């Protein structure tokens, strides 16, 4: 029995649960940049098939932005989370605590670089090296929360997923052994 069959409806509901959780947690009051979307994009890339991997974080962002309101830099934010899905896909062959932590850190850095470079293109900062530097310096206080949330939510999401997978593997082994005894 395959893992997805053993997980049954739980695995099928995973994308929808992630979308709902991501949107709700992003809308709920929280400190700036302390949201689960980066970790959700990582997990989606690591465990969901093809289009679902990208659809989950984009749908969570779109749902929450429909409530919160879209903003000038949204294309940069969406692009950064789609890129984080690609980082998550590098975890597919082997997910370890160290690899998940490294992917979470890389995701935080990528989000910081992409979104702040995009912010620099806007009207707030002069389009000079001094303006670029001012933009990145102003963003440093927010980077801490991005890093903390990506690490904490990644450990939580991957831990929950791996625990559920372990339970499903045991269930599949029991069902397989029971089917084998009856034949």
Regions inferred by a protein language model and the residue ranges of each:
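Membrane-embedded alpha-helical hairpins and interfacial helices in multi-pass inner-membrane proteins
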Residues: 96-177
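Membrane-embedded alpha-helical segments of multi-pass membrane proteins
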Residues: 16, 31-43, 75-83, 117, ...
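Hydrophobic transmembrane alpha-helices
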Residues: 1-46, 52-55
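Central hydrophobic cores of alpha-helical transmembrane segments
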Residues: 53-64, 100-108
């Amino acid at each position: 029995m395959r893992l997805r069959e053993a997980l049954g409806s739980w695995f099928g509901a995973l994308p929808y649960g992630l979308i709902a959780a991501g949107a709700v947690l992003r809308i709920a009051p929280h400190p700036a940049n302390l949201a689960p979307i980066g970790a959700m994009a990582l997990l989606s890339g690591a465990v969901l098939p093809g289009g679902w991997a990208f659809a989950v974080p984009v749908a969570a962002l779109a749902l929450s932005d429909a409530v919160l309101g879209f903003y000038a830099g949204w294309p940069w934010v969406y692009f950064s989370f789609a890129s984080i899905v690609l980082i998550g896909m590098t975890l597919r062959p082997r997910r370890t605590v160290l690899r998940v932590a490294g992917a979470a850190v890389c995701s935080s850095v990528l989000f910081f670089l992409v979104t702040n470079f995009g912010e620099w293109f806007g009207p707030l900062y002069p389009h000079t090296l001094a303006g670029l530097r001012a933009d990145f310096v102003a963003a440093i206080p927010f980077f801490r929360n991005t890093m903390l949330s990506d690490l904490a939510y990644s450990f939580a999401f991957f831990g929950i997923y791996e625990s559920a997978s372990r339970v499903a593997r045991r269930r599949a082994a029991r069902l397989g052994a029971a089917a084998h005894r009856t034949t």
